[in-house]
Amino acid sequence: MKVTVIGGGPGGLYFSILLKKAVPDCSVSVYERNKADDSFGFGVVFSDETLSEFLTRDPQSYDLIRTKFAYWDELDVARDGEKVRITGNGFCGCSRKTLLQLLQQRCREEGVDLHFEANVDDLSQFSDSDIIVAADGINSGIREKHTEEFGTEIEMKSNRFVWLGSTRPLDSFTYFFRTTPYGTFVAHTYQYEEGMSTWIFETTDETWQKAGFSVTDEEDTIKKISEIFKEELDGHGLISNRSHWRQFPVITNKKWNTDNIVLLGDAKATAHYSIGSGTKLAMECAIALADSVIKYKTDTQAVFTNYEKLRRNRVEMIQHAANVSLQWFEDMDRHIQHDFMKFAFSVMTRSKKVTFENLALRDPLFTQKVLAEFNTKEGNTNTTTSAAFTPFTLRGMTVDNRIVMSPMEQYNAKDGLVTDWHLMHYGARA
């Protein structure tokens, strides 16, 4: 069996390791357009759950990587000098460059052929390959040549973001929000190795335009951002690495394969960085694809069917959560107006995957602060009462709680106007 992987990112490399390890007589080759030590971006994030999966799949790479991780259990939400810490968020960060180098090392140990500075434009040279894995990233050339077959859809979102680094040490994942005369900016930040942290700055397109940023002027970007986040950077500078302002593309594909080509990683599906699942998604899909190839070998249709069966629902669930989170940040000028604890709670629950009950288990002190702020503002003497069960006043009417049941379908009004059915129904009860 011969398998060719186009793209030497975490997903492509991890797939190659797992397949070659399980099927040593399989020929596995990886072609990467960049140099072996090139890496764009700074750090990557994994959850405790994902790390556990890596341990069971390839202990060797897990042992190599885990010594390089920066771990944290806390998440901070900061807004214009106010800050609250929420515990119970098990994550770790790692340098993307270090991760790639360690995965490359494991590939060589297992006998995977690695080819760097190999820009693949024509797949005909791999006509003898049983499977071609298109792991060539968010701007996948292979996907672009087969958009109709894959059913590719790309939606460019409106917010602007730029990926930078800093020497500023951080002991938690932190969201720094800053209000400016132009609008709201947020920095998604975390430490990924000793003395280095990732800083992803995001704002709405309108705010970005008002502030006078340029897409590719890195020097100007650093100057302006450093001034906005002067207090948060605490004397530390920002570091660029081809750090251009971008807009996030939400990529979906109706099919993940065509002929003997199969999509992996960002070429297949993107998840907004605000939920930290991009690299996780790629590597978990690499596991499923490797399992499918190991099970069905050269029966490519069975391989691809099983791959989608294992991952389609999970990928779409993560994408949905990421898109909901993305939408929250597109509306952050509205959210920023809330009282601080309510705002922090909104940040934590923005993807709808985390609920009040989840947070109460992770950090009961935080949810107590949220309720206390809410009840104090509402004039309730019991500061532990759930918001849903507090009275609510609408003009001259006060109801006992805030729970609303949706009406039955027959109560629907046409264009917001009552019909003869409503007149008869309510008239009979007058």
Where are these regions (language model features)?
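Conserved mid-domain beta->alpha element of the FAD-binding
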Residues: 4-21, 133-134, 164, 244-324, ...
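Conserved FAD/dinucleotide-binding core of flavoprotein oxidoreductases
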Residues: 82-89, 95, 110, 171-250
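Glycine-rich FAD pyrophosphate-binding loop
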Residues: 20-40
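C-terminal helical "tail/cap" subdomain of flavin- and related membrane-associated enzymes
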Residues: 6, 67, 291-381
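Conserved N-terminal helical subregion
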Residues: 48-165, 364-377
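Conserved N-terminal glycine-rich FAD pyrophosphate-binding loop of Rossmann-like flavoproteins
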Residues: 35-53
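Conserved Rossmann-like nucleotide-cofactor binding loop
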Residues: 11, 15, 36, 139
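Flavin-dependent oxidoreductase catalytic cores
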Residues: 368-430
